[in-house]
Amino acid sequence: MHDEPNGLVAAIAASWKDLRGGIRRRLAGGPSEAGLLAHAYLAGLLAFVAGLPQAMSDARALDQPDAMAGVLAGRLFAALFLFPLLLYALAALQRLVARAFGGRGTYYTARVTLFWAVIVALPLVLAEGLVSALVPALPPRAGAMLGGIASLAAGLGFLWIWASMTAESESFARRGHVVAVFLVIVVLVLVLVRLIPS
């Protein structure tokens, strides 16, 4: 077994090289709940920074005085308060669904897995933010297409990272179980989103 690399950036890079090994090392290190929460805050804050180009665009579209302050305040609140709560709820859902398919993890391992998957996926989020900053300089159709491709790539990349790490933390030997877990999670999230009034 390899030791956990020193520093967050080195640990992220090592996890990119071997996703299952990365979560195995992280679980072996036994991060504290405070450490997990710190990861959630870090991910939320970096996602907030990556979303600044979109926030500026949203504020301009409102065409109201102080729109920028309102948009930024709302996004910062979501990043630092709602995002961590969402991660905890999603980790619990992941554990419940994985258990139904024979997963052998715990609620703790589900939290470690999801929170670390979010941290490892941060380069994708930051790259998407960079692309979003370039979109206004492009023709509208090309900008929309490029922005959509970047968002899709970041989303699918995150799902791949999360699924690979879940396979390890839940001791799934067969890929079918992982696919089933994530199909159920996606369906449940979509149903919940439809039930929440706009």
Regions flagged by a language model, labelled:
Residues 2-108:
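Selected alpha-helical membrane-embedding segments in polytopic membrane proteins
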Residues 77, 91-198:
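Hydrophobic alpha-helical transmembrane segments and adjacent short intramembrane/lumenal linkers
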